Each structure stands twice: as structure tokens, then as C-alpha cells.
Amino acid sequence: MNYANFGLDFLNSVANAVVEGKKLDLASKGLQLKSRALDTERAFNYDRLAFEKHKFETNNDLKIYGDAMRISALRAAGLRINPYSNGRQIYQDEADLANLHSYYSFYKTD
């Protein structure tokens, strides 16, 4: 039996065990990074899906209720909404009120 070869074989097996341990550590870190990347990608896809769903629902609501929402906002702002008017017509009482206001603002009669 050659004891020199036995010593080299023993050192070689120890070195191989250390190398295999390092390989396992690197492989586990690689799997952790891949898992983290997949989790991030999945979260991004879920967030994008939620955004697309919100965008679809908003567009759907605007298609269905958009005109009514616009009219109610204009009325809330104080505008007179006449669906049969072209927007250039005013009523006589509005013209009288505008004339009266311009008269009092021009001829300050305090």
C-alpha cells in the first residue's frame, strides 16, 4: 500500500467535498435569485392586470354614463343646460338681467 497516494487521495476527496459544497451554495443562491425574479415578475403582471381591469371599467363607465356625468358636472358648475338649444340662444329674462347688471355696473348709482 502506498501511503503517499493515500494522502493525495484523501486531500483530493476533501478538496472535492469543498468544491461541491461551494457549487451547492452557488446553486442555492441562483435558485433564490430566480425565485425572487419570478415573484417580482408575477407581482408586476398582477398589477398590470389590475390596471387593465380598472382602465376597462373606467372606459366602460364613461361610455355608459359619460354624457350624464358631463351634464351633471355642468349643472353643478351653474350652467344652464338646454338639450334643444345650440348653445347660442338665451332667454329674455337672462338678457334683461345682463342688461340690468351692465347698466348698474356702468352707471354707479349708489
Swiss-Prot record:
InterPro entries: Vesivirus_VP2. The keyword ATP-binding does not apply. Keywords: Capsid decoration protein, Capsid protein, Host cytoplasm, Virion. The keyword Transcription does not apply. GO terms for cellular component: host cell cytoplasm; viral capsid, decoration. It is found in: Virion; Host cytoplasm. Pfam families: Vesi_VP2. Translated by a ribosomal termination-reinitiation process from the bicistronic mRNA coding for VP1 and VP2. Minor structural protein that forms a portal-like structure at a unique three-fold axis of symmetry, following binding to the host receptor. The channel formed by VP2 may allow the delivery of the viral genome through the host endosomal membrane. The N-terminus domain points away from the virion surface. Belongs to the vesivirus VP2 protein family. Homooligomer. The portal-like structure consists in 12 copies of VP2. Interacts with capsid protein VP1. This is Minor capsid protein VP2.
